[in-house]
Amino acid sequence: GKIQAHHQYHWNGSWDWDEVSTPILMPVERQGRTIDALVHPGRNGYLWTLERSADDISFVDAEPYVYQNAFASLDPETGRPTYDPKHKPTTGSTTSFCPSLWGGKDWPPAAYNPESGLLYIPANDNHCGVIEGREVTYMPGSAYMGARTQMTVPEGADHIGEIQAWDMNTGEEVWTREFDSHNWGGILTTSGCLLYT
């Protein structure tokens, strides 16, 4: 009944990028060996690969799968991000950041197909946000957010929604299907490599 291991994708987050989907269990090739991986397209816009064992979870690598400007870098050993202070919301300021508080992937599930070896992600790219942090007084029965939020699309963006296919053995995106509007559809993949979304 106790937590045996964990990995924190980012710390002290003020973007509302809590993770709402479970990682996908799959074998992944890295540096000549097969690892038991936890793969997770995070709301923060990064595609995370972690190694799992009975009593440990360790960072392997992470790559942005949508445009992301809040992280300046990731520590290559731990995966801990360094934040770009221009894109970290704080009380008393108005801050723009990408992806939006809905994330690069929100509730809709991604899917892995062992036949194709591909991970399929329902993503929203070119979807950013603005948060105006402000002091609030708690009032029972009222929203207690401490922020005013707005969703934005960068000038010149030609799409938002995507279905992405990633080869997790190479860590590379294989193909993308773009949509003019958001993609809120989950993905199911079958034997024979059909995709339903």
Labelled PLM ranges:
Residues 98-139, 158, 165-172:
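Long hydrophobic segments that form regular secondary structure
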